[in-house]
C-alpha cells in the first residue's frame, strides 16, 4: 500500500496539481520498520524515480510530537487532502491480521457473483490464532483460504504447503504477530492485551465507515477512469505492482563469507 500510494502521488496527483514528480517529497508514516528498507529496492522505482522518499515509524512520529511539545491527542480532527482523501473500512482493516484477506473477499464476492454481499464481516479470518483457514463459498464457487501471522506460524504453514499437506487458493501472510498493529515501529507497550485493543479499534473504524468495500471508494473509481484506465491494465500493473527475485544463494554466500572471517 505504501508504494502504491506513493506511485500514484508522483504520477496522477503530480499531474493533477501541476507539479513535477521530482519536486514532491513523499513521506509515509508506518507501523513497520521494514518499510524503510522497502523504499530502497530498485524494483520500486517508477520511471527511474524513487516514489517514497522517507519513512517515519509511528513510534518516531510520537517522539517528534513530544519533542516539539505538540499535544497530539488534543489536535482537532480534519479531513484528508483531495484527491485521494477518501478511505474505506476495508482499508482500515488492512492493519490487522486477516484484514487484507477480508477486504479482498468483500470485493471478490461481489465481482464474482455480481451481487451485494449480505454480511460484510468474515469471522473465519478474524482473531489472533497463529494460523487460520477456511473455505469460503462465493455462491457455488468455493475457495480455500489461509491467514498466518508471526514468522514461526508462517514457516509452519509454508512447510505444510510444500509437503503437499495443505492446498489454498489465497493466502495472507504478515510477518508481525497481530499484523501491522504489532509492527516493529509501533509504540512500545507493556499492556498484554494491547493487540486485542488495537484490533478492536480497527474493526470499530470499519463498522463506523460509510464506505466499507474497497471498490466503492469514489476516489479509486475516479483514479481508474481518469488515469489507470481499468483494473489490471498495463498502466496499473506498471505503477501498482512489483516483483521479487530469489536471493537465497546470495544470502547463503554472504553468511559463509561472514563465518569464514570469524
Regions inferred by a protein language model and the residue ranges of each:
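Iron-sulfur-associated redox domains of electron-transfer enzymes in respiratory
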Residues: 1-262
Amino acid at each position: 500500500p505504501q508504494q502504491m500510494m506513493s506511485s500514484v502521488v508522483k504520477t496522477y496527483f503530480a499531474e493533477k496539481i501541476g507539479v513535477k514528480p521530482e519536486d514532491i517529497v513523499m513521506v509515509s508514516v508506518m507501523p513497520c520498520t521494514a518499510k524503510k528498507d522497502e523504499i530502497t529496492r530498485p524494483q520500486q522505482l517508477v520511471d527511474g524515480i524513487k516514489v517514497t522518499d522517507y519513512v517515519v515509524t509511528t513510534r518516531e512520529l510520537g517522539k517528534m510530537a513530544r519533542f516539539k511539545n505538540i499535544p497530539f491527542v488534543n489536535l482537532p480532527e480534519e479531513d484528508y487532502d483531495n484527491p485521494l482523501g477518501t478511505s474505506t473500512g476495508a482499508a482500515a482493516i488492512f492493519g490487522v491480521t486477516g484484514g487484507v484477506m477480508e477486504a479482498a473477499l468483500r470485493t471478490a464476492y461481489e465481482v464474482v457473483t455480481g451481487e451485494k454481499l449480505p454480511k460484510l464481516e468474515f469471522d473465519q479470518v478474524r482473531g489472533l490464532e497463529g494460523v487460520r483457514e477456511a473455505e469460503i463459498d462465493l455462491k457455488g464457487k468455493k475457495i480455500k483460504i489461509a491467514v498466518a501471522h508471526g514468522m514461526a506460524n508462517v514457516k509452519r504453514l509454508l512447510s505444510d504447503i510444500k509437503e503437499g499437506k495443505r492446498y489454498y487458493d489465497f493466502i495472507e501472510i504478515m510477518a508481525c504477530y497481530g499484523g501491522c498493529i504489532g509492527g516493529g515501529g509501533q509504540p512500545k507497550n507493556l499492556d498484554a492485551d494491547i493487540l486485542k485493543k488495537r484490533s478492536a479499534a480497527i474493526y470499530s473504524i470499519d463498522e463506523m465507515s460509510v464506505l466499507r468495500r474497497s471498490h466503492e471508494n469514489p476516489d479509486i473509481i475516479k483514479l481508474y477512469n481518469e488515469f489507470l484506465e481499468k483494473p489490471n491494465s498495463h498502466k496499473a500493473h506498471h505503477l501498482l505492482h512489483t516483483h521479487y527475485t530469489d536471493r537465497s544463494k546470495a544470502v547463503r554466500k554472504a553468511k559463509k563469507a561472514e563465518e569464514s572471517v570469524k
